[in-house]
Amino acid sequence: MNQENKVLPLIPLRGLIVFPYMVVHFDVGRDKSIEALEKAMMNDQQIFLSTQKDAKIEEPNEDDINSVGTICSIKQILRLPGDAVRVLVEGISRGKIDKYLKQEPFIEAEITEFKDEDNYEEYEIKALMRIITKEFGKYVKLSGAVTKDAVDFLKDIKEPGKFADIVSSYLIIKQEQKQSVLNSIDEKERLENVLTVIKDELQILELERNIGVKVKEKIDKSQREYYLREQIKVMQDQLGDDDEEKAEIKEYTQKIKKGKLTKEAKEKALHELKKLENAGAYSPEGAGIKTYLDWILSLPWKDKTKDNLDIKRAREILNKEHYGLSDVKDRIIEYLAVKKMSKSLKGPILCLVGPPGVGKTSIAKSIANAVNRNFVRISLGGVNDEAEIRGHRRTYVGAIPGRIIYGMKQAKSNNPLMLLDEIDKMSSSYKGESADALLEVLDTSENNKFRDNYLELDFDLSDVMFVTTANTLETIPRPLMDRMEIIEVSGYTYEEKFHIAKEHLIPKQLEEHNMPEDKKITFMDSSIYYIIENYTRESGVRSLERKIAAIIRKIITEIVEKDKSSISVNSRTVKKYLGEDVFSADKIDKEDKIGVVTGMAWTAYGGDTLPVEAVIMPGNGKLQLTGQLGDVMKESAQAGYSYVRANSVKYGIDKEFYKNKDIHVHVPEGAVPKDGPSAGVTMITAMVSALSDKKVKHNVAMTGEITLTGRVLAIGGLKEKTLAAYRAGVDTIIIPKQNEKDINKVPKAIRGKIKFILAEEVDTVLENALIGGINNDN
């Protein structure tokens, strides 16, 4: 390969690759490119053309231009109206950019020129050229984009490099493929590259031709079917077999005229009926039209149920069917009260957020019962296709409406209470964002014209009362959340679970098991508390109901086998029926200890206590963290350690303790992953206690995020954390001052038994947690 170095002006091309021996014209508009042309014309009329990697870039830098291009000779320059220039060039040889010399006022680079060698006598190269000529002939025939003269022209070319370049210039292929051929400096490699490209293109062209043949066959088939159908119609008319079909058409006509349809729906139905009449009821197309008409006629376009706006009755129903959940009940009563005054009020869109089993789904049924609306539930868990919400278009085989329209059909009224269950469990896929499809459904200003893809008709959802449920808000997209009124349904207290079990679950299970009147099962209060405390660990009451059902089944078995008339269940007999205790209640230490602090945590099943331990050992200032802590919790511990080092003197700690001591912080139950920033104050207290040799009050629990400067920041889940601490025997809780407003969410009975200490600074936490406070007379 002959090489020669040159310094040439450079023009970056957009969407065009020029090969050696190729004559082409293009327009130049960029100032730098016009300057480069003028420079080339003043010298030997040679210029280097290389293609941009991205045609959209207006001012490419060195990394945006392919390093291999073509040295060209300028044949003609034509000034166009405006500032543009049209230039005619002929490719001479390949070139590669060694380095850029300047960027202004035009791009100039040092180029290595590669000239092809005369090695066309090699047998392998001759064979490659012959195969390419044959395959290129097939390409010309199949594509129809290149004239047959091109094949004849190639037969006269002996040089392999020139042959490969000219073939490449004729091929209609992607820019990346052309650049790959241009990058091939070696002639043999270039020929192999061109052959591969041609073979790939031939496969694609062959597939295109086969597809075209199949499409034509289908069109011919449909035309033949139409002709046969017309013949069948004539024969049916002669034989009188179309009476049944006419009767069906007549029945649809009467249903459409008598049905309570909107004007648009009636017009669409009559139009489809006309198509059915033409196609024939028993044709493949007719079956799809009949299904579509059945859907239109089955929907409650104008059917409504009358709202019962009796506030007193509604409150009685809600209280009777559910214990607690006062926030939800109050919001429904408010809606009914305002609706009573203003008839045009749209239904609220409530989102009940809380852990599993707290009654989110069942309260929705009670709301429907209270306001006298039909109830329909739509489960959204696992939905990852927007067509599940909006429906599939009728062009697809087996198309059906989406879940919203299906729910309206089930409801049999256009103002039901529609429960969208587990809205946080929706996901996205290549089929579309299913959550985005709900935006129109839940937008009260737009949902009066909800359009399902299958129906292609406007359906009014504005009178629907939507209630959604979720376990967490984290996975719900923000635009969707903005359309809903969030009501948090937190876990039940022990007292609330007791009342729910006594007043709802036990009577329900006894009724489901059809207990005869002469047989009696009685649950003592102590037994209910014992089940709650030792056999369930949840925020809701699902597991509690299963345990009660298990006891009743065992008692019924005992009654049948031993012919007993009545059985009373106490805490002792619970163990007999359910086996050994599954859980033991968290209890705090009964004595004050150094480096042992009780923290508080929120879980999906409610609150829990979070003991934190810290020990000091000889070392060089390392902080070791164990207990399967998450990244946020580790960073919280690091921040706490830095704060302790910065304020060691204030707390009576040797200011150079880190030179000869290591701290190990451990959070027990190491198999359970833990994360979150709210254990910051707990970790600081454990470190200060261990370093200052001061004991921590065993009856104190705490929660709060900390900063490097010692401020205590707000946390979430205070109610659940407080309930857990109370169960464990804590009587004093230190919380961030910013959470003072959340104390009212704690049940009044428990609030009166807990002393809350509000902390804005870490000093307040340590003063109330350490025995002796934080004076430095250690």
From Swiss-Prot:
Its main location: cytoplasm. ATP binds at residues 354-361. Its EC number is 3.4.21.53. Keywords: ATP-binding, Cytoplasm, Hydrolase, Nucleotide-binding, Protease, Serine protease, Stress response. Induction: By heat shock. It catalyses: Hydrolysis of proteins in presence of ATP. The keyword Ligase does not apply. GO terms for cellular component: cytoplasm. Residues 8-202 form the Lon N-terminal domain. Disulfide bonds: none annotated. One of its GO terms (biological process) is protein quality control for misfolded or incompletely synthesized proteins. The active site is at 678, 721. Homohexamer. Organized in a ring with a central cavity. Belongs to the peptidase S16 family. ATP-dependent serine protease that mediates the selective degradation of mutant and abnormal proteins as well as certain short-lived regulatory proteins. Required for cellular homeostasis and for survival from DNA damage and developmental changes induced by stress. Degrades polypeptides processively to yield small peptide fragments that are 5 to 10 amino acids long. Binds to DNA in a double-stranded, site-specific manner. This is Lon protease.
